[in-house]
Regions:
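Helix-loop-beta segment of a Rossmann-like dinucleotide-binding subdomain
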Residues: 1-33, 55-57, 138-148
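Active-site substrate-recognition segment that forms the wall
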Residues: 68-69, 77-173
Length: 173
């Protein structure tokens, strides 16, 4: 499925991880080890005793209630939202969010990861996974106050399709 007009290639051992399965496996493992997994919740406050964080206060966006949870260890694993939680702890960090869009195709066109050998740019990797493949990603800076309001644009879809076809023309169909 590679573009027949490619004039050169380098074989590089590469692979991919299914992020959905990895996330599900991490959640299941955490639950097996006693974790309580919460979704649709926002940390609003860190609960401290003698200067140490002993829990969190959160807002549950489903029940519309505030809840408190206590634990011997509190871990900030909030990804891009981690800046807010770090600020609650008095740690000032500046994260620089970037929006990355990708396209997932309902069919697979390649059996190996295809990367472009160039400086990182939009749509420079085609990744197979089970019965699908994906092309991505775009990367554009985003103001921190807009991280909860991201949408894929038609221009991004067009760019991903156009650039993806250069790796595998079959993506045009």
């Amino acid at each position: 499925s590679c573009n027949p007009d490619i004039i050169g290639a380098v074989k590089v051992p590469d692979g991919s991880v299914d992020p959905f399965r990895l996330t599900a496996a991490n959640v299941l493992d955490a639950k097996l080890h006693g974790a309580k997994v919460l979704v649709y919740c926002e940390v609003t406050e860190l609960i401290k005793e003698a200067g140490a964080v002993v829990g969190v206060k959160l807002y549950n966006n489903v029940s519309k209630q505030y809840e408190e949870y206590y634990a011997p260890i509190t871990l900030n694993a909030a990804g891009i939202w981690g800046q807010h939680i770090a600020n609650l702890a008095g740690a000032k960090i500046n994260m620089f969010p970037a929006k990355g869009s990708l396209l997932v195709f309902g069919h697979r066109v390649n059996n190996i990861v295809l990367n472009r050998c160039r400086k990182p740019a939009d749509a420079d990797i085609l990744v197979p996974g089970d019965t699908i493949c994906l092309i991505g990603t775009t990367s554009s800076r985003l103001p921190y106050d807009q991280i909860d309001d991201m949408k894929v644009t038609a221009d991004e879809v067009d760019l991903l399709l156009r650039e993806g076809e250069k790796l595998a023309p079959e993506l045009a169909y």
